[in-house]
């Protein structure tokens, strides 16, 4: 029984569960999507909140440039490149034996400075927001001061009396541990069994305490939350419920708008933008999608991509039960090579906030992630970790879907021909060479 209902009855009410349970790659295009002007109210946050987050990151830019010299060229702003991947697009046409109209671009959060993943957005932002609250409250800086002062010894000594804790499959912990340690905080990262060893090693090299679990992500988060509870000197970064994380990710959208403008890419009803976002617990893709809907309204179509073994957000939103159900409830094992997406229970906050704003959800099996990883490297010379390829099949899923989604959304052949598809590459820039070689060898063996 699952929430008092037999699995057989769940399958009658929600027939797409059969494919999820059988681990078959599948998709579901959301029939409940609503106009963004109406559905954005579900989130409980607005454009002013995102603007406030953007301004905070600007205040911290001098400090980031001082602590991380690799960001000096961008003035301490942590941002990634947007690149067209036309050769990969051609390779996908051959791979899927389909026309795949439109243009294909890659957002390279995989190569963001500091931690090499999308988590350098939300994770670093939340730690900075917490540091600012402490610094303002204790008179270390004023809002108009040069925040690079927070790197001075007295400020570091102050932060050293405070702790930052987080539960993670890897990349969020990497971001929070590195920025926390750089500011002087005591940092502890509770890591699930899925976390890669090199990520644990890197954190320890930065002086971060790594607590390892033999169980999955949800247990690591719960243990981290429990350890932090009741300690006024510990700030727990709650990936399942944090609005600060969400806003840190949302800032990406206005910056993307500037990059699209610079590339001469129009986004409107006749030139739709499809953004394919890998999804774990949901905070990163949810925050980015929220920002995109604020920036582009109904001209942007956001889709979440998950591993077949960890389809937690698909399951939660499709059934309407959100965090009340886990993939394990239905016999899905939550074991995937896409370690950054190995989450069995979704964020209820994100699922409810975004359920009328997202166009759809789809799953990808691990072998396909490795094929696409090798195909991207072969065609464009770009190397990503498996999780980051989850969005790559999206252009084919949209083009070939049989559920009437394109007709419902007014996505005519002419509009699809004018479309821009953006694959959000979430991580991989810091994967050790030996590990990347193993990824590529597996992918090439599956392709050839």
Curated annotation (Swiss-Prot):
Pfam families: PALP. Keywords: Lyase, Pyridoxal phosphate. The keyword Protein biosynthesis does not apply. InterPro entries: D_Ser_am_lyase, Ser/Thr_Dehydratase, Ser/Thr_deHydtase_PyrdxlP-BS, TrpB-like_PALP, TrpB-like_PALP_sf. Coiled coil: none annotated. It comes from the Bacteria. PROSITE patterns: DEHYDRATASE_SER_THR (PS00165). It catalyses: D-serine = pyruvate + NH4(+). The modification N6-(pyridoxal phosphate)lysine is found at residue 119. GO terms for molecular function: D-serine ammonia-lyase activity; hydro-lyase activity; pyridoxal phosphate binding. One of its GO terms (biological process) is isoleucine biosynthetic process. Its EC number is 4.3.1.18. The keyword Ribosomal protein does not apply. Its cofactor is pyridoxal 5'-phosphate. Belongs to the serine/threonine dehydratase family. DsdA subfamily. PANTHER family: D-SERINE DEHYDRATASE (PTHR48078:SF9), THREONINE DEHYDRATASE, MITOCHONDRIAL-RELATED (PTHR48078). HAMAP family: D_Ser_dehydrat (MF_01030). This is Probable D-serine dehydratase. It comes from Pseudomonas aeruginosa (strain LESB58). The gene is dsdA.
């Amino acid at each position: 029984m699952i929430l008092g209902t037999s699995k057989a009855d769940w399958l009658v009410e929600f027939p797409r569960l059969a494919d999820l349970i059988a681990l078959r790659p599948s998709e579901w295009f959301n029939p409940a999507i609503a106009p963004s002007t109406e559905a954005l109210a579900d989130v409980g946050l607005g454009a002013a909140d995102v603007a406030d987050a953007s301004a905070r990151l600007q205040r911290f830019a001098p400090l980031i440039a001082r602590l991380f010299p690799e960001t000096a060229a961008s003035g301490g702003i942590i941002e990634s490149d947007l690149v067209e991947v036309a050769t990969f697009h051609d390779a996908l046409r051959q791979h899927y034996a389909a026309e795949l109209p439109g243009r294909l671009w890659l957002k390279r959060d995989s190569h963001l400075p500091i931690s090499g993943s999308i988590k350098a957005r939300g994770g670093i932002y939340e730690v900075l927001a917490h540091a600012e609250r402490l610094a303002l409250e204790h008179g270390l800086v004023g809002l108009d001061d040069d925040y690079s002062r927070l790197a001075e010894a007295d400020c570091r000594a102050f932060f050293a009396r405070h702790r930052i804790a987080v539960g993670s499959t890897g990349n969020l912990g990497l971001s929070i541990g590195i920025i926390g340690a750089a500011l002087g905080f005591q940092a502890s990262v509770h890591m699930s069994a899925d976390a890669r060893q090199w990520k644990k090693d890197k954190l320890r090299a930065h002086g971060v305490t790594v607590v390892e679990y033999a169980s999955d992500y949800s247990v690591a988060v719960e243990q981290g939350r429990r350890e932090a509870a009741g300690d006024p000197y510990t700030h727990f970064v709650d990936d399942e419920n944090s609005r600060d994380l969400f806003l840190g990710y949302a800032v990406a959208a206005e910056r993307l708008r500037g990059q699209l403008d610079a590339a001469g890419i129009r986004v409107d009803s006749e030139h739709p933008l499809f953004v394919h976002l890998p999804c774990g617990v949901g905070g990163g893709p949810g925050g980015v999608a929220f920002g995109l809907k604020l920036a582009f309204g109904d001209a942007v179509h956001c889709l979440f991509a998950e591993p077949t073994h960890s389809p937690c957000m698909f399951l939660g939103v499709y059934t309407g039960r959100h965090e009340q159900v886990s993939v394990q409830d239905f016999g899905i094992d939550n074991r995937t090579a896409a370690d950054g997406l190995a989450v069995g229970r979704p964020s209820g906050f994100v699922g409810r906030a975004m359920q009328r704003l997202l166009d759809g959800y789809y799953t990808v099996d691990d072998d396909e992630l490795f094929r696409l990883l090798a195909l991207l490297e072969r065609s464009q010379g770009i190397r990503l970790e498996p999780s980051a390829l989850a969005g790559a099949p999206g252009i084919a899923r949209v083009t070939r879907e049989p559920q009437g989604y394109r007709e419902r959304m007014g996505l005519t052949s002419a509009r699809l021909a004018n479309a821009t598809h953006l694959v959000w590459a979430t991580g991989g820039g810091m994967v050790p060479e030996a590990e990347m070689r193993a990824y590529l060898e597996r992918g090439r063996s599956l392709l050839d």
